[in-house]
Amino acid sequence: MAKLGVNIDHIANVRQARQTVEPDPVQFAFLAELGGADSITIHLREDRRHIQDRDIYLLKDTIKTKLNLEMAATEEMLRISKKLLPDYVTLVPEKRKEITTEGGLDVKNNEKYLKNYVNSLKSSNIEVSAFIDPANDQINSSGEIGFDFIELHTGKYAGLKGQDQYVELQKIIESSYYAVDIGLIVNAGHGLNYQNVKKIASINNMNELNIGHSIVSRALAVGLERAVREMKTLISIN
């Protein structure tokens, strides 16, 4: 059964909308764990639009599961992550004007830089993942660089319907098997919700799904603990 990583960025979004102290994502991480989250995911963006530096250190000290830090491959983030020492880092592309991450990291065309970057993280015993599109050339480069994991971008799958969605699902399935064959652990995320998650969760070699927006949206009606528990139930039913 795939594990569930709960992204709590949207809790911080509500707080930052008023530049105040609540809701506190650290408190909500505790509720996510009570609901069965296997890890807590946070994205420390360069512009600090939601998660703040104080959040990451408090989360590292207080959560009982694992901490997945999403970040851009910048020198600032390298320094922060080597000080924080999260359980693992997921490298993502980042654009200032985007609402959310729009696509996968271009590992293939940045191999030299990313290899040095990944080696630096791993020298601090941090496992490293690449958030990439389901494409074999990106998977190959991820393996050659030395990433421990990949996270397959499911945003396109989530935005399609019918036969088009089926075709994209097959691409994700094929990519996941290919990645496992070359020694990578496979995660997936982006756009997954209570309606579309089961087909991704049922992929045999899927390690973990990272889900945020849909869980936080559901939590407005039923509370975060229950929202996480409901998602865990869906993931476990194949």
Curated annotation (Swiss-Prot):
UniProt-annotated site: Transition state stabilizer, residues: 151
UniProt EC number: 2.6.99.2
Keyword field contains Protein biosynthesis: no
GO terms assigned for molecular function: pyridoxine 5'-phosphate synthase activity
List of catalytic residues: 43 (proton acceptor), 70 (proton acceptor), 190 (proton donor)
Keywords per UniProt: Cytoplasm, Pyridoxine biosynthesis, Transferase
Disulphide bond pairs: none
A GO CC term attached to the entry: cytosol
Enzyme superclass (EC): transferase
Sites where the protein binds 1-deoxy-D-xylulose 5-phosphate: 9-10, 45, 50, 100
Main location: cytoplasm
Subcellular location as annotated: Cytoplasm
Superkingdom, taxonomy of origin: Bacteria
Binding site for 3-amino-2-oxopropyl phosphate: 7, 18, 191, 212-213
Pathway: Cofactor biosynthesis; pyridoxine 5'-phosphate biosynthesis; pyridoxine 5'-phosphate from D-erythrose 4-phosphate: step 5/5
Residues annotated as transmembrane: none
Known catalytic reactions: 3-amino-2-oxopropyl phosphate + 1-deoxy-D-xylulose 5-phosphate = pyridoxine 5'-phosphate + phosphate + 2 H2O + H(+)
GO biological process, one term: pyridoxine biosynthetic process
Pfam families, alphabetized: PdxJ
Record's subunit section: Homooctamer; tetramer of dimers.
Function: Catalyzes the complicated ring closure reaction between the two acyclic compounds 1-deoxy-D-xylulose-5-phosphate (DXP) and 3-amino-2-oxopropyl phosphate (1-amino-acetone-3-phosphate or AAP) to form pyridoxine 5'-phosphate (PNP) and inorganic phosphate.
Protein family per UniProt: Belongs to the PNP synthase family.
Protein name: Pyridoxine 5'-phosphate synthase
